């Protein structure tokens, strides 16, 4: 069945005054095409828009789709032949053409053939051209602003006398309206001595009425407009000689209403004028205030302001008014570039239909509106430019954002709070969803705060300080994440969260507009527009609280953020050798690491520089290097100012060294003060003013060879076409033995724990029985010195008759990280080789780490099945037939054999068994060989050490 289109709908819409339509016509889509913008800049990318040709079966009219309807075109729901019903639309005159802007529609039927033979409809109001020879001096502009709509004597220029055709005006709340005296759009005119004011029936407009008092006949010849002459219907605006009081409604589709009148060049009869479209209108702030005809006072238009929804805002509406609640407001920020500087702030708006949009104020507008805008209040906002939203910083569901102008825009607070407008609109995401989200994504979060860290002060890249505080958030998804609070959030809200967590209660917190990052795994941080509410009153909050109290508090949780140690932010702990070995800093982003090292050398030729002490508009110090003018004054090129006393700041270059190597690093003022404990100006005065070289040298020497924790920024930089790795110390603190011990113990605990959280080593690991001398497995690190009966792997030492090597012979020798002995490295240690051989032959794993326990992975010997020792130290019979190849007896290895070997392993010097020639206590027959190993500890038998470097 062929659908029924609304007859005459296109003509009715086209002849309707600018503004929202009052009918809901059924039309057919004849064509759909994307809107292409010529000479558009490559960035920012304009929002994608589509235009349609709509038909009522007889006439067609161009239309523009709201961006919210773009998905209907992309999924082919809207295509040629589709029959739709327009439920919300408006009609405006754009560049001399009537355009229907479709806000909402219903799709009634698809795949219909084109009904009838429709032709393009040209509105009668656009068929007449204004006389181009009309001089501007004969007209006067009027900036009458009313809350009614299209002006009955709208903006016009007096037409030629022969123009007698009747024309309807097209006023409205969304663009420059035309009134009863025609249009002056695009025509620049000079103010005249008299003016005719006008009112209409739609939203607040600025009607540009143009007429000339010289062209008007004397009062006796002039037809006086009154309520009878201007009221074809009961709903039409009325005008009296003394008052102008428009009614609240205008019959929108009656072409006979709101006729325009103008004074001809001669005579006193009003006639319909012509219009001139397609030229830019003169800004309203350049127009003089309205001057009414001398016929008595004119009353204020008290009709209600026409409000449009936020979703209907688009750049094609020069005049609009929205009613919305401020849901968020940013702090005022200072900015500067090479061309200008100023202030800026933004705020988010939400209306009763759920539409959201962001408004920005720059420079003078920021100073004017910042004090007026309050979060939670409802405002009427009119006039402002709409620009494409920068989605990198603005994630509201709108393609545009408002820029308020100090001369055009108006912001009026509503005295009564409109309860139909929600206070905030959330789109909560679960923490588990953040794992696969891209960085810089803006999200809303709701979760339980499980822990709060103390606040800390850090230095920004621009040189200013800011505060940060980290909290852990947990939700129903069984995931947790670290959220960083920045700036003012650390004080009020952060302190409140800290107190509640310390008291045992876990508050629930809602974030609006937090940003996802990849620091420390996955994390979330606040930004300038983020909103934070503690224990909000949402239905989701109660459900989350009940879950946490019943099961969530004790339920296992997976953290998306890497765990932090107890020393605040801990960047990866690295050695100096690892900087080169792991190619740190070679990628696009710098690497942030922490190095434990000592300062071995400080370059003192230029350890500081004179800096500009002036404050920049952004609130931080300039710090640019100042130049001495030679007359006692210093000059800054950036600030272009001269001053008498510069501020000296550190610019250090020094060498740091640890047990793996050394490298050069740089440090600026903050890190330099942490190293020397005094300002650069004091050190400069000691050396250059007091010329006390001895004290200066003492200060420099005082910082050498002390252990520090250096927080380094490692980045590859290019200088003179050469790439080099640069290490910059951004924070330096002296090593605290207590804190460092906690860090090391935590690292050891992580090594000792298997994935189930249970240690493979004995409970007394690392301790020796002082009575019996029996050893248990220990967790001592590779640099521990063993002087008791066991080494760091729990190996029982052999005690045998023999003399120890003198202490002097062990100086400056290497310390083995496996057996703890001196004189060799771990790579050639026979203990490690024997361990690998035994456990591989017995079906066990090699001892590559602390968790690799012989054979079966338990803490007992796999040979005798008894705890307290490893298989390599088993005193009982081995099940694998591992016996000493010298004496053929089980219970020990050849390196610990106390009897003479059958292979004739005797000292060739003294011809006595039990030791090798290198360990011979007697006189050597030849040149004395240097001894190897460290036999100071009596518990270490010489036979063990005799194996070093031999077999």
UniProtKB/Swiss-Prot annotation:
It comes from the Eukaryota. A zinc finger (C4-type) spans 612-639. Keywords: DNA damage, DNA recombination, DNA repair, DNA replication, DNA-binding, Metal-binding, Nucleus, Zinc, Zinc-finger. PROSITE patterns: ZF_CCHC. Belongs to the replication factor A protein 1 family. PANTHER family: OS03G0429900 PROTEIN. Heterotrimer of RPA1, RPA2 and RPA3 (canonical replication protein A complex). Interacts with RPA2C. This is Replication protein A 70 kDa DNA-binding subunit C.
